């Protein structure tokens, strides 16, 4: 009887620990998939609004990218300006 109790209790713990481990893997994968910070789209929109004060441009003419190189983060801003 003790062997059956041991197997039953072990199976329940194993199922819970497997589910927990799978969830941790999914969360870690989701975090790794985020290539840009949450504030980047808002930053891009604000930059478009500021640039529009001086130059007539569309939103798709401004691209913002954030690149991590070691301990440094590089913010790259590309603006397609209209011909004069």
UniProtKB/Swiss-Prot annotation:
The keyword Endoplasmic reticulum does not apply. This is Cell division topological specificity factor. Belongs to the MinE family. Signal peptide: none annotated. It comes from Ectopseudomonas mendocina (strain ymp) (Pseudomonas mendocina). Keywords: Cell cycle, Cell division. It comes from the Bacteria. Disulfide bonds: none annotated. Pfam families: MinE. Prevents the cell division inhibition by proteins MinC and MinD at internal division sites while permitting inhibition at polar sites. This ensures cell division at the proper site by restricting the formation of a division septum at the midpoint of the long axis of the cell. InterPro entries: MinE, MinE_sf. NCBIfam families: minE (TIGR01215), PRK00296.1 (NF001422), PRK13989.1 (NF010595). The gene is minE. GO terms for biological process: cell division; regulation of division septum assembly. The lineage of its organism: Bacteria, Pseudomonadati, Pseudomonadota, Gammaproteobacteria, Pseudomonadales.
């Amino acid at each position: 009887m003790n062997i059956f109790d041991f197997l039953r209790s072990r199976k329940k713990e194993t199922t819970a620990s497997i589910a927990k481990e799978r969830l941790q893997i999914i969360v870690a994968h989701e975090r790794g998939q985020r290539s840009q910070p949450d504030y980047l789209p808002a930053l891009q929109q604000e930059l478009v609004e500021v640039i529009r004060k001086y130059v007539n441009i569309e939103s798709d003419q401004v691209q913002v990218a954030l690149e991590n190189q070691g301990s440094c983060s590089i913010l790259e801003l590309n603006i397609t300006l209209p011909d004069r």
